[in-house]
């Protein structure tokens, strides 16, 4: 997090490095990278963090499984293709890490009640970027699209299940994503913070061999959902 904050501060340092310059957020700024949005294709990279949760639907009403999530990190690259003046197609493959702990009710033993679910995802989002009219060196935008995750931490091929303390999730999942951000044009590059939600479409849970398993028997579906915050540099 300290490194991410330091990178954010670089933008403002560049903006204020000369006393006689007009800053990005001034009333009448000098227009930076004026022809950038006319580029057909451009690339960048991003750093960020995430908070993954699980949406659990049950077959019958009963005590809910509690999910403790922690803040993970993201890193990846961006390929952007301009389709028209206000519409871009973006591909943002990256590595995402997250960790969750499930607390099951009605277990006397902590060994049975707790299940740790780690995720090391290769994230493949394909997004449409809808940009507004540029105002000075600021250009807000909306994002929407679909994504697929390959979970490198998945143990889907394991023959063991929760009876052997093995909680299993599928390797591939699909999601839809919605969010917004802002392009900030500095003298040498574009800094683009964004926030979006990712919502799982497919069920990720692999059931235990016992259909009446106290860990998976009452679960209709288990889908990931996440808040993703990225700081992109072009």
Segments the model singles out, each with a brief description of its role:
Residues 181-234:
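Predominantly the C-terminal beta-signal and adjacent terminal strand-loop region
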Residues 65-83, 88:
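Intrinsically disordered, glycine/charged-rich N-terminal periplasmic/extracytoplasmic linker segments
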Residues 39-41, 69-73, 118-124, 138, ...:
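Residues that define the transmembrane beta-barrel architecture of outer-membrane proteins
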Residues 54-67, 98-119, 150-170, 205-220:
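Flexible, solvent-exposed loop segments that connect beta-strands
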Residues 19-71, 234:
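Short glycine/proline- and aromatic-enriched beta-strand/turn motifs that initiate or cap beta-hairpins
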Residues 37-41, 49-55, 80-155, 230-234:
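Gram-negative (and chloroplast) outer-membrane scaffold detector with strong preference
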Residues 28-29, 76-77, 125-130, 180:
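Short, well-ordered amphipathic alpha-helices
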Residues 1-24, 231-234:
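Bacterial Sec-dependent N-terminal signal peptides
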């Amino acid at each position: 997090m300290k490194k991410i904050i330091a990178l954010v501060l670089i933008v403002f340092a560049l903006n204020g490095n000369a006393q006689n310059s007009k800053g990005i957020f001034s009333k009448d700024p000098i227009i930076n990278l004026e022809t950038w949005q006319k580029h057909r294709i451009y690339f960048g990279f991003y750093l960020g963090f995430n908070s993954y949760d699980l949406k659990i639907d049950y077959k019958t009403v009963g005590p809910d499984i509690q999910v403790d999530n922690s803040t993970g990190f993201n890193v990846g690259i961006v390929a952007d293709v301009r389709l028209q003046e206000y519409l871009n197609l973006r591909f943002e493959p990256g590595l995402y890490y997250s960790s969750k702990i499930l607390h099951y009710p009605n277990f006397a033993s902590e060994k049975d009640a707790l299940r740790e679910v780690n995720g090391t995802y290769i994230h493949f989002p394909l997004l449409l970027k809808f940009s507004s009219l540029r105002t000075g060196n600021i250009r807000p935008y909306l994002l929407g699209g679909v994504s697929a995750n390959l979970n490198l931490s998945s143990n889907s091929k394991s023959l063991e299940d929760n009876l052997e303390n093995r909680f299993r999730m599928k390797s591939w999942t699909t999601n839809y994503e919605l969010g917004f951000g802002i392009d900030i044009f500095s003298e040498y590059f574009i800094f683009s913070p964004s926030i979006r939600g990712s919502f799982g479409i497919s069920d990720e849970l692999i059931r235990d061999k016992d259909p009446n398993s106290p860990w998976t028997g009452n679960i209709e579906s288990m889908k990931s959902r996440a808040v993703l915050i990225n700081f992109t540099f072009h």
